[in-house]
């Protein structure tokens, strides 16, 4: 399965605090794991705002993801346009872009976000941990 990990799941994976269901998916060699520059951007913004739950260095996280064979999914204008096709269930622009990317690329979005879980389509919900 091709999985795009949302920002929260990426942070938990990096910290080694994933819930068991999410951890099984992440360590399964049959799955291809993707991350988006959207998550790196979100972490950088929220870190600069002093959010204590985003205190990882985004450059170090990115390097660690690449070193652990995660695939970086570039953002395209097609992804930006796909955001407009999403129902207005969620106001978070980072999460909306992640979902648009997953839909456009045929990936499943792995998330612990209860609002993202309400969207139809390729969303896999796992408990936060």
Each model region followed by its residue ranges:
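Alpha-helix capping/helix-boundary segments
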Residues: 9-10, 39, 79, 98, ...
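Acidic, PIN/NYN-like endoribonuclease modules and their adjacent C-terminal/linker elements
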Residues: 97-129
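Acidic donor-binding loop at a coil-to-helix junction in glycosyltransferase catalytic cores
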Residues: 94
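Acidic catalytic patch
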Residues: 61-88
